[in-house]
Amino acid sequence: MVIPNLHNSIPICGKCDPKLTNSFIGIVLFLAVLIIGILILILFYYNKEINKNSSQYLPIHSPGSGNPSPSSSFLINNNNNNNNYHQNNNSNNNNIIYNPYYNSSTTSPYYLSPNSNHNPSLILYHQSRLLGNIHSINSINNNNNNNNNNPPTNISNKLNKNGETKNI
């Protein structure tokens, strides 16, 4: 006994129902798009976590404090020669400046000493554009304890003949 239209419901001799074929292809495509979407969401989540963890190296962050400190984020006066941010024992490293231009030749990827081959005034200038104020240039290269507490001065201030700042 022969069942009529059997080749329309199940594959026989390489033939199958076009409706079943289209449904199968649709299900496969839907699952593929779903899996790719989930993978993209996972990548975005991990990228966000990586960016959150790397935000401690932004220029407006004061190392070691845990909180942004715009007044002291780019210049750190340290009276001791053994600081944790710059491992260079060849010279006095009392002033540590954030290095916005990473150079593999420096001893630290994020901080550099003013007595390295970089220009600290140039780096300080770039920091002043971000923060709006600037420490006096004398406090960069001066290791005297009396000058470590100089307040930030405006970038338009100049020194007069007596060494005092005056506004222009």
UniProtKB/Swiss-Prot annotation:
Biased segments, Low complexity type: 142-157
Keyword terms of this UniProt record: Membrane, Transmembrane, Transmembrane helix
Keyword match Membrane: yes
Keyword field contains DNA repair: no
Topology of this chain in the membrane: Single-pass membrane protein
Residue ranges crossing the lipid bilayer per the database entry: 24-44
Primary location: membrane
Ranges for region Disordered: 69-92, 142-168
Location within or outside the cell: Membrane
Listed GO CC annotations: membrane
Protein name per its UniProtKB record: Putative uncharacterized transmembrane protein DDB_G0288353
Natural source organism: Dictyostelium discoideum (Social amoeba)
